[in-house]
Amino acid sequence: MAASAPRFASLAKIIFISSCVTAGCTLLGMVYDSFAIFTHFICYSLAYSAAIAVLTSTTFFARRVWSPPKWRKGAVFVVFAQALVPLSLLIPNGGVELNNPERFSVTWMNLHYETAAVNELVQIVKKRPSDIVVVAEAKIQQLAEAFSDYPFSREVTSASLYVFSKFPLSKVTSVSNDNDRDFLVVEVRVKRRKFTLLAAHVRWPIYSQHAKTLANAAQWATRSENAIVLGDMNSTPWAAPFRRMLRDGDLKHSRQGYGWLNSWHIDSDKHFGLPIDHITYRGKINNTKFELIETEHSDHSAIRGEYVLAGKLTRKPRD
């Protein structure tokens, strides 16, 4: 029995150090692009660290290592440092003062080229009406009849991005990105006010162009007084490139105040996932509601936000 204690202590150290390394890489991903991929797994790293912290609190553990209180304090610190990151999503955004705003709603979903997912989204929109529906990974043949009650639509077929709107759309632009999918940029007119909508489907952060693409989105967002930037960003809210996009684009995250809300799922049963689909906004826009809508036929869930829009009044449209 005495001989097993040193082996246990060595194993405990290895496990503890591995949790610290994992946590460190995750936290570094909030600052450095090269570590950004680790932020995708912060909740799983947190669960691992929490399990280690529980182990250090047991009598079984205390009897087999030197100075167990220090181990416990270290384990709790690692858990606390990581927990602050996802918990930050519970802090709501501060709103801007708006005079006589207009209301609109937006739904986004990556359809994964599944016809069943298209039909599922149609049913979602019927139950939760949206003024604007934006989708990715679909073919125009799949969408031809699905959103026929939306009088305005635009697309960038090279990126498989589509916008369907009950409000007039204009100034459609396909914005190119180096070694990444194009953006779909369009101006949306809500009665006498307007905003720019940028839809994106960004490559994974393991590619070098990921950060440049998000930086380009921030740059385009600042060209308009009011903007909505949304899509499958393939990034968590805490990854360094995404945080920089929010900062440089003066964008707010619709998830703030609503929590984790995993939108892409690793497993078919959708028990494990990542929050990589986003709706962000800037200017004279406030977010009044944000929700995730679980789906069955795509690996992505739908996300929906409700907003109020103010700002400069445009000329009244001619009859």
What are these regions (language model features)?
Residues 106, 112-127, 134-319:
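Soluble catalytic domains of enzymes that build or remodel membrane lipids, polysaccharides, and related
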Residues 2-146:
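N-terminal, active-site-proximal structural segment of metallo-dependent hydrolase catalytic domains
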